[in-house]
Structures are given as C-alpha cells and as structure tokens.
C-alpha cells in the first residue's frame, strides 16, 4: 500500500463506493469496468450492453474541483487511487479520459438516485474509463457463500426479496414465510434506507440473522447485505432489483403492491408493469403481493385482498409508527413486532439503560431459584410476557 500512495488520488464517498462495489462484483452486469464515452452512448441509446439489459451506464466522472483537476491530467495506462474518508480503498487503471456528455446523466448509475434525493447529485466534466479494483472483498465473499449454498442445497426455485427491515415486523415475517413455502431458497437482500430517522444497519442485520437462525428452517434463507449503496432504497429502482436478483441466481422476485416505481397499468384487463421487459430478458418471474395488515375482526395477519372487514378494522404496519415507539423506549405490541426482536432492538438502542438490571429482574420476574445473570434484552423479553398475562384483565 506504500507504493499506492505515490499514485494520484480521486476522492469518493460511500454512495459512489457502493455503486463501484456493485459493478466490480458483477451484481448489475457481467461487465465490471468503468465505461468510456462510446459505451455510455450505446447504453443510453439501446438500454442494452453486450446482450444484457442495462438501464444505467457505468460512466464515472468524479465530481469536485480537485478530482476534476486530477482527472483532466490522467492518461491511458496510469493508475489512480480511490480515497474514501482518508483511506485508499481501491484503484483505477485508466484506459481513457474523455469529456462527459451531460445529456447522458439521466441514464448514469452514479446518478440513478437523483430524482429520489433531496440533494442534486453531480458528475464532473472529465470521465475516466478502465478496469478497477476494490480492496474490501466482503461483497464477493457473500456472493461466493450464496453460490456455495445454492450448489450444496441443489436449489432450483430461488426467490429474491428486497427489504430495509426498518424495523423487521410481523408483516415481513409473513412475507418471508409465504415466500419460503414456494421456493427452495429465499435470498433476502438487506438494503440501506435514506430515512433520516432509522435503525442502524448493523442492528437490522443482527435482527434478520436472529430471526433466520431461530425461527426459519435451516439453509432456506440467505441474507445478502447491501450496506454501501442506496440504489435499492425506497424501492425506487425496481429494474435494478430485477437485474441484481437474476444475477445472483434468483428466478423469482417478490415485491409489494405499494412498491414505488413499478408503474402498474392495465392492458386488456391484465396487470402490467414497467418490469415486464426485464421479466422476459432475465427469465425472472415477478410476483406482486397485496398489502398485509392485522385485522381485529379476523384476529390475525391478513392481506387487504382476503379480508372483508375494511380499513376501520385493520392495523397497518407503518414503519415510522413502530420506530417512534422503539425510539422512545416502548416495546411495540406483539402483533406488530415479535417481542424477542423488540427486545434485541431496544437493548441496542438503550445500552445500559437501567442502573441495576439484575435487581430489577430479580424483584419483578419469577426465576428457577438459581442465580441467573440478566441482561437488558432478557428484561424486555420477560416484561412482554407479563404484559401478555391475561388472568387479571
């Protein structure tokens, strides 16, 4: 790495890094390099590249005066480092430096979130094409682990689901279970959220892993973490979801009826979406599920299509409402979030919340008579059990 310091450096942020990570690990295409101006034009014109559907080109024109000053002076054959937060995270072997065509920005992977962002995203005047490397191989390791599981299990019916799981609630549970029933393997892509008030990604990952390990059949669900990019956030780019799912072996993608961006329309009384072209190109079946709610008449979780009782009897799984409870230290009702999951989240949000958790648990809960060390998480789980005791209500 010492010699790498002698190279010129381009500064990037996490979002750019996340897009580069997807490109390098062939999550979006079999093509894994930065495109030149001619390749960018081909993608913009055709929507395909090397026979693959490609809604966005991989044109990289680093923004910022310092970055552009460096980019303008680069030449073919030169290596330039990628610097993120003061650390060299990769490098580009420059094949070509070119002037970036502004008319191509709408179809650029690094600007794909622009219409869904409050801030204007930017590219510079000079673009850089060429092969590149990233030194963190965690995404490749996850991809290899998934491929190994597919090979080991012999899974043929593979279904993908994209979730922010912010937070993971009972509706998510039902969605995953319904998906498992008709698949050999379910790949849950855990994606980032752009919500300002959100549960930390690592906590959400722990929750999904906990649920997978304790409440689902072994090796039926694989959690694939996409933590460095918001390209899939808010489900604003469903075409990318289709491509990523297919690239990682899925032949079915399950999305919600309220999935933003799918653009549902009717033709001859048949439901169509903008994803139809990708269904055919990728041999991917896209399933649109109705919204799941809790009905106080049915006394269970139902879909809005199967419940006859109307909205005035239906409790919806609003993420912001559930988060409001959690962020205020309140356990959501068990019909909204599994108590064990609420306990896990609260124990992470409020570390060492209680002055003497051991005494609190000993005085409040029954025990086996043996000395048992208690944690904040144990407290929340036991407390919910007391709330659910109905003999005196």
Give the role of each language-model region.
Residues 1-236, 242-251, 255-393:
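Non-catalytic terminal extensions that flank enzyme cores
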């Amino acid at each position: 790495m010492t010699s790498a310091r002698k190279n010129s450096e381009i500064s990037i942020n996490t979002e750019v890094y996340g897009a580069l990570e997807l490109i390098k690990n062939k999550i979006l295409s079999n093509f894994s390099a930065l495109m030149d101006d001619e390749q960018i034009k081909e993608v913009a014109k055709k929507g395909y590249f090397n026979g693959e559907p490609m809604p966005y080109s991989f044109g990289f024109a680093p923004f910022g005066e310092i970055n552009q000053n460096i980019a303008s002076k680069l030449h073919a054959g030169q290596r330039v480092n990628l610097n993120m937060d003061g650390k060299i995270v990769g490098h580009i072997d420059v094949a070509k430096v070119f002037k970036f065509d502004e008319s191509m920005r709408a179809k650029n992977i690094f600007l794909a979130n622009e219409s869904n962002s409050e801030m204007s995203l930017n590219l510079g005047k000079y673009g850089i094409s060429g092969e590149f490397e990233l030194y963190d191989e965690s995404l490749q390791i996850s991809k290899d682990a998934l491929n190994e599981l597919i090979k080991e299990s012999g899974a043929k019916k593979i279904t993908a689901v994209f979730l922010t799981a912010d937070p993971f609630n009972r509706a998510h549970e039902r969605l995953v279970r319904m998906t498992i029933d008709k698949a050999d393997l379910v790949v849950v892509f855990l994606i980032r959220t752009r919500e300002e008030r959100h549960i930390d990604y690592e906590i959400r990952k722990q929750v999904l892993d906990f649920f997978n390990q304790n409440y689902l059949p072994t090796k039926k669900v694989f959690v694939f973490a996409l933590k460095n990019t918001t390209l899939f956030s808010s489900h604003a780019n469903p075409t990318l979801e289709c491509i990523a799912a297919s690239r990682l072996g899925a032949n079915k993608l399950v999305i919600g009826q309220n999935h933003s961006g799918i653009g549902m329309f009717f033709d001859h009384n048949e439901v169509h979406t903008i994803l139809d072209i990708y269904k055919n190109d990728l041999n991917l079946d896209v399933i649109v599920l109705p919204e799941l709610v809790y009905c106080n008449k049915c006394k269970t979780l139902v879909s809005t299509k199967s419940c006859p009782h109307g909205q005035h009897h239906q409790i919806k799984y609003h993420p912001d409402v559930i988060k409001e409870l959690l962020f205020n230290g309140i356990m959501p009702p068990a019909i909204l979030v599994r108590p064990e999951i609420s306990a896990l989240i609260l124990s992470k949000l409020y570390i060492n919340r209680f002055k003497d958790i051991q005494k609190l648990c000993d005085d409040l809960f029954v025990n086996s008579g043996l000395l048992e060390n208690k944690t904040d998480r144990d407290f929340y789980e036991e407390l919910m059990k007391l709330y659910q005791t109905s003999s005196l209500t």
